[in-house]
Every structure is written in structure tokens, then in C-alpha cells.
Amino acid sequence: MGVLALQGGVAEHEKVLRQLGAETRKVRRPEHLEGLDGIVLPGGESTTQSTLLRMEGLDGPLADAITAGLPAYGTCAGMILLATTVLDTREDAVRLGALDAVVRRNAFGRQIDSFEADLDFTGIDDPVHAVFIRAPQVTEVGPDVEVLARAPHGEIVAVRQGHVMATSFHPECQDGEVRVHELFLGLCADRA
């Protein structure tokens, strides 16, 4: 299982994936994409990640791999990178275009506005405790996008389109919360 390792919560995602029995590989260059069963795009700072993706020549190969069927799961900044349309970002920001959705950066406010909430999540029996840190929000979804979870006021915060999944929040930041990653690993197994 690959974890995009340019910036952000790489170690936290690796820890959860390993707890679930997955082998992990840090992805920093195009050749690191070879042979992966799936890839996690961690949270962090989306414009920084965008710049680094382009500098490493990874933006095109990553988009191509996901388009060709590589399962992908993006959290927070990863959701932003996966979306087809992003509001409140730089014009030159990388858009992998793998998720037919409109996403607004920092939709819930600044760092001081970070919050936690328990969410009903499609495919998971009990509520998921979600940590939102300068989180994006999905404002529109295409016809093939399934909404998996909403924030307490109805905002879309988790989605899936085929082999691509994304959350506004950080399940990797909640000790013992492995169920969202487990759902993604199931998606990867279904594609194998």
C-alpha cells in the first residue's frame, strides 16, 4: 500500500495501515507507483503538496495510475488533490481529477475552528469519531459519487466514486480508529 510521502500525515497513515496488516511504501517519485495495490493521499497543506507533486514529476503519473484503476484514498488535503474542481485555491494547483466533485478548501474555517464530531458513515456500523483540522467540504458531487458521511450540519465530508474514496477529516489522528482505512483496504481487495 502506497502513502504519498511529500508532506503531511504520512507516518500516521502508515501506522494505521500496518495495524491492519498492510505493507506500506512511501511514494515520492513516479517509479514508486509500480506494483501498488492502492495509495493514500494524506492530509497536510494542499498547495504545498501540489507544488511538490509537480516538482517531483509525480502529478501526471499519479493521475494516470488512478485513472487506470489504482484505488486511492485522500484525507483532507488528499481530498482536495483528488477532486475535479477546487474552490479557494491557486489557479495552478494540481487537480488529479479522479473524484467528480467540487471541494472547498478550509471550508470549516481556520486552525482555531478545528473540531471533532461523531458521524454516521456508510459501510461502518457505529459512528466514526472524526477530527476536522482546517478541513475541506464537498459542495457538489457528480452522479456517480456516493456520499458516505455528513458533518453535523449536513455538509458532505466523505465520498466514494468507484475505486476512489475521500474524507474531509483525519481518521488517522484518532487512536484506535482503523475502520475507515479498513473500508479502503476492502476496496483495494475488491479491485485486485
Functional labels for PLM-detected ranges:
Residues 6, 77, 169:
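Cofactor-binding loop segments of dinucleotide-utilizing enzymes, especially the Rossmann-like FAD-
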Residues 26, 74-75, 159:
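General beta-strand structural signal in soluble alpha/beta enzymes
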Residues 41, 74, 167:
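Redox-cofactor binding/interface segments in oxidoreductases and associated redox assembly factors
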Residues 46-120:
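Cysteine-nucleophile active-site neighborhood
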Residues 23-25, 72, 164:
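Hydrophobic anchor at the start of a short beta-strand
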Residues 3, 72-74, 130:
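Short glycine-aspartate micro-motif
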Residues 1-55, 60-67, 122, 178-192:
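N-terminal beta1-alpha1 cap of cysteine-dependent amidohydrolase-like domains
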Residues 105-192:
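Amide-donor transfer/coupling interface in amidating biosynthetic enzymes
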